UniProtKB/Swiss-Prot annotation:
Transmembrane segments: none annotated. It holds the Pfam family Toxin_2. The keyword Cytoplasm does not apply. It is found in: Secreted. This is Potassium channel toxin alpha-KTx 1.9. Keywords: Ion channel impairing toxin, Neurotoxin, Potassium channel impairing toxin, Secreted, Toxin, Voltage-gated potassium channel impairing toxin. GO terms for cellular component: extracellular region. Expressed by the venom gland.
């Protein structure tokens, strides 16, 4: 799912994804973070 975090690289999404889902897995898509 997408979370409301802007990004330029996938690495930027790992900490917020870990906070949101418990897993540090995510990608940057369309400048927004998508968590696994």
């Amino acid at each position: 799912h997408f979370i409301d975090v802007k990004c330029t690289t996938s690495k930027e999404c790992w900490p917020p994804c870990k906070a949101a889902t418990g897993k540090a897995a995510g990608k940057c898509m369309n400048k927004k973070c998508k968590c696994q």
